[in-house]
Amino acid sequence: MTATASALRMRGISKIFPGVKALSNVNFTVEYGRIHAVVGENGAGKSTLMKILSGSYAPTTGTTEIAGVEVQMRRPADAQKLGIRMVHQELNLVPDLTVAENIYLGRMPHRRFLVDRQAMLRKAAAVLKELEAAIDPKARLGDLPISQQQLVEIAKSYSADPRIIVLDEPTSSLSEHETTALFSILRKMKSQGIAIIYISHRLKEVLDIADDVTILRDGSMIDTRPAAGITAAEMIRLMVGREVANVFPKTPSKIGPVAFKVTGLSDGEKFHDVGFDVRSGEILGLTGLVGAGRTEVAQAIFGLAPLATGRIEINGKAVTIGSPAAAVKAGVAYVPEDRKGDGIVPSMSVRENISLPVLRRLSRLGRIGMSRDRGLAAKYTRDFSIVPPDPERRINLLSGGNQQKAIISRWLAAGPKVLILDEPTRGVDVGAKAEIHRIIGELVAGGMAVVMISSELPEVMGVCDRVVVMRDGRASSPIARGDLTEERIMALATGEEPA
């Protein structure tokens, strides 16, 4: 290592899969003590480049240098030995283990051939304290909200004394306050000389936190610039190869009578006395800080969690929903926040994932009619522009945006009256986000009632007809589209303005 050596220098990196050139002659350099953002649409090559850096893929051509020394990484363990750590968007943790056990999994301290649990707890507590994360190291990981699990994942990487740390969409599950806290952690790491690679679709955050920005498009490196010398609009133009006039277009729709109404919903713990209604042809936004109870309300409406009190009405008639099957029968569909854990079945094809809720309808005498099954999948693959347009492809091989379109297709196949979408554009690029907004717009134009949970305020304000803000398990009165401002939403979410 020389005094002026870069933390990372990848030269001429190409990666060819059968029939696909995922990366083409990419040059990528990252310096110690700097935060380097990588942006691009899904399919631009970000994941492939990071998988090469982390040792999961070998490049077809090209070289990688760490601290001025050329290295070859044939497996993730090789990258880890070189001080490279990855924090994935889809968390790589064990829910049934404690926070401390997750942080030190695979490298727990031992004493006389046994795990030294007290030493492990002390070390975990010290790491969490250094990162200013108020998390009990003895807590079961699965009992924590996703936002705190994300911080545990970061603590796990930080505890390994990394030289280079890669964060993939690290704020996708965090509130604005938690994002600010994370940025404080990243700046502390930066001050310690750690090289940080920051992958995100949230361009405002990229400009807030990054020192440098690299834009990828179609497997090629388009540009690298200081973050201070580029705007979000320029990044979008370079990412997609065109000007994007309106990231959140509002599709006109005819708003009809109340199609869905909830009154006095409470689970006795995480949300209390929640009420709102949605009209046919309307998008009702449900926003607030992470932990405000939005997802818990949606899960209870869909029958995934019990209600202590409350009334649910569809088209003016009270319905009882005690399970997801009962919800689907009543005409309610729910697209969950956690695509990987609760949405897709990774081992199944796109066709099989789309058909799951309607297998009985597609079957005759207990046997599935394959022509009807294939026809249904082909229709949604075509209508929703799922890429690649192959219903037999395993769904886990698709980008996040295309997986999300397949999940939405699944529930539309069930013919719902009400569609609840929980963070539908979380972790997808601008192009996929626009496609998902187009789909939602077409649904409400056709008369469907949509409840959209989102933490992204520009999205809420751009797409929704009315917005309900949740704080500490309670819901505000709905705010009409014309009265929406980011300041008002945040004031309600933080308690600065009474609900």
From Swiss-Prot:
Part of an ABC transporter complex involved in carbohydrate import. Could be involved in ribose, galactose and/or methyl galactoside import. Responsible for energy coupling to the transport system. It holds the Pfam family ABC_tran. It comes from the Bacteria. SUPFAM superfamilies: P-loop containing nucleoside triphosphate hydrolases. Keywords: ATP-binding, Cell inner membrane, Cell membrane, Membrane, Nucleotide-binding, Repeat, Sugar transport, Translocase, Transport. Its main location: membrane. Its EC number is 7.5.2.11, 7.5.2.7. Belongs to the ABC transporter superfamily. Carbohydrate importer 2 (CUT2) (TC 3.A.1.2) family. This is Putative ribose/galactose/methyl galactoside import ATP-binding protein 3. Residues 8-243, 253-497 form the ABC transporter domain. PROSITE patterns: ABC_TRANSPORTER_1, ABC_TRANSPORTER_2, MGLA, RBSA. GO terms for molecular function: ABC-type D-ribose transporter activity; ATP binding; ATP hydrolysis activity. It catalyses: D-ribose(out) + ATP + H2O = D-ribose(in) + ADP + phosphate + H(+); D-galactose(out) + ATP + H2O = D-galactose(in) + ADP + phosphate + H(+). InterPro entries: AAA+_ATPase (IPR003593), ABC_carbohydrate_import_ATPase (IPR050107), ABC_transporter-like_ATP-bd (IPR003439), ABC_transporter-like_CS (IPR017871), P-loop_NTPase (IPR027417). The keyword Repeat applies. It is found in: Cell inner membrane. It comes from Agrobacterium fabrum (strain C58 / ATCC 33970). ATP binds at residues 40-47.
